[in-house]
Design a protein with these regions (language model features):
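Secondary-structure edge/capping motif, primarily at the C-terminal ends of alpha-helices
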Residues: 47-53, 70-77, 99, 122-129, ...
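Extracellular/lumenal glycan-associated surfaces
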Residues: 54-75, 108-124
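Helix-centric, low-specificity signal for extended rod-like, repetitive segments
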Residues: 5-7, 35-37, 137
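Arg/Lys-rich, low-complexity, intrinsically disordered N-terminal tails that contact nucleic acids
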Residues: 1-22
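Extended intrinsically disordered, low-complexity coil regions enriched in Ser, Thr, Gly, Ala
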Residues: 62-94, 124-145
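Amphipathic alpha-helical binding modules
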Residues: 104-154
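Short, flexible domain-boundary/linker segments around small modular repeats
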Residues: 18-54, 80-106, 144-150
Length: 154
């Protein structure tokens, strides 16, 4: 090995991330309770605002994103979990329809029951999933949403 090759080889080694193992371990641990609580406070607050008819579009988007991410995780967990999330998403479609017709968000009676179950399930999924799993689910939900927007059918 000549001097130039040695110099290039050393340069490659210096660019490696010496703390990469920390990221791998942290990404494969369950969510800390404080993180789950912080996320769920925002989601539950937005959900309550949707129920009361005082929600903004951002509140609707927050709850919808949580359910879509939860659906991705639920698909890999259990068909019953998947059906629970799908019923919650259907309730969100009805909620959006009410907003288009009346100008305020809201749910029907069965929609409230479905949403209560879906939000509770999302909290359980968030608690039991590690950060890496939730990041993968978030990316998959984003890709699925882009396909839906662009009219690509799965």
């Amino acid at each position: 090995m000549n001097t130039l090759q040695r110099t290039q080889s050393n340069a490659k080694r210096q660019h490696a991330d010496p703390g990469a193992w920390i990221n791998v371990i942290a990404g494969n641990q369950e969510q800390p309770a404080w993180n789950v609580a912080a996320i769920m406070v925002k989601i539950r607050t937005s959900y309550e605002l949707l129920k009361s008819g005082h929600a903004s579009d951002a509140d609707f988007d927050r709850v919808g994103a949580a359910l879509n991410i939860g659906l991705i995780r639920a698909e890999s967990i259990d068909p019953l979990c998947e059906q629970t999330m799908l019923r919650g998403i259907d309730a969100m479609y009805v909620c959006a329809g009410l907003h288009e017709r009346h100008g305020t968000y809201g749910f029907t009676g069965p929609g409230i029951v479905a949403m209560n179950d879906a939000v509770d399930l999302y909290e359980e999924i968030l608690t039991k999933s590690n950060g890496r799993q939730m990041t993968i689910a978030q990316e998959a939900a984003h890709v699925r949403l882009l396909k839906l927007i662009n009219g690509v059918v799965q």
